[in-house]
A protein has these predicted regions:
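Extended, hydrophobic/aromatic-rich amphipathic alpha-helical segments that build helical scaffolds
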Residues: 71-85
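Conserved short "hinge" loops at termini or chain/domain junctions
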Residues: 1-67, 84-278
Length: 278
């Protein structure tokens, strides 16, 4: 049984103003109750975690994270339910009907409605994730680990990389590519130890000034690569030099095996050696 959206009035409170009430019909809430349960479980398992969701349910109705979570559940529930609903376009928006004498809305309109709800859902996801990072319980969850596994824990990356489709679907498609790129940069330039540390700090919003600079520059290289550009070796070298010049801010790198790639052993000839040149 759903815990955050429990009746028709609450459901409509969190939906875009497109569904009109049709007199004599079963309430929209009753029609999509199963989808609300499914959407709530999806939000918990994908984004929020059970512990954090229970905390959110205890917040007051005007709490920002509670409002965004409810909007996300409502939009996803309706997006799932629409294919099984009978819809009619009324002067006040779409209505849910079962009267066979009423002509349903066209497939094109319904498809556009589903797309609009997906966009609305994705906007909710984009707004929710930064709020979740302020919840201490959430930071220790499996869900936080998923989003914190790259330098791009939020959906903003989808606005920086070319592509089509919903933001959430594109984020999921980009994620494995980002993981591969970051792994390559870690091994060859930045060290796995440093990236592991700054990813968590980036998620928590606790980066120091110099580490913010590093993350900004590293992300710029990753975004460029995702858009089909080759890595800028000169720029990567500049980033490494920045790390080398600020050892107190990047101890993970200085203690790593990767750092040794940029500090080759110095060979000195003795005066007895042939070819002595100094």
């Amino acid at each position: 049984m759903a815990k955050l959206i429990t009746n028709d009035d609450t459901l409509r409170q969190y939906l875009p103003n497109v569904f009109a009430t049709v007199k004599g019909e079963v309430s929209l809430f009753d029609k999509v109750m199963v989808d609300i349960d499914l959407a709530e479980n999806w939000v918990i398992e994908t984004f929020v975690s059970t512990k954090t969701f229970n905390t959110i349910c205890g917040y007051t109705a005007d709490n920002p994270i509670r409002i965004i979570t409810a909007k996300l559940i409502a939009s996803e529930a309706l997006r799932r339910a629409i294919p099984s609903l009978d819809l009619v376009l009324t002067p006040n928006g779409f209505g849910v009907v079962s009267n066979q004498n009423v002509t349903p809305a066209s497939k094109e309109r319904v498809d556009r409605l589903i797309g609009s709800l997906a966009d609305y859902r994705d906007d909710c996801i984009a707004n929710l994730l930064p709020l979740l990072s302020r919840e201490s319980d959430w930071l220790g969850s499996v869900q936080a680990s998923f989003f914190g596994e790259t330098l791009f824990p939020y959906l903003a990356i989808t606005e920086q990389v070319k592509g089509n489709g919903s933001k959430w679907e594109r984020y999921l498609a980009l994620r494995p590519k980002i993981l591969d790129i970051e792994a390559s940069l870690a091994d060859e330039w930045f060290s796995p130890e440093l990236l592991l540390a700054v990813r968590l700090e980036n998620l928590k919003g606790s980066l120091t000034a110099n580490r913010k600079i590093f993350v900004r520059e590293a992300k710029a290289q990753i975004v460029g690569n995702l858009n089909g550009e080759t890595f800028n070796a000169r720029r990567l070298a500049d980033i490494v030099n920045f790390i080398r010049l600020n050892p107190d801010d990047f101890t993970e790198w200085h203690n790593s095996e990767t750092a040794k790639l940029f500090a080759p052993p110095v060979f000195k000839n003795t005066k007895k050696s042939k070819g002595y040149f100094f």
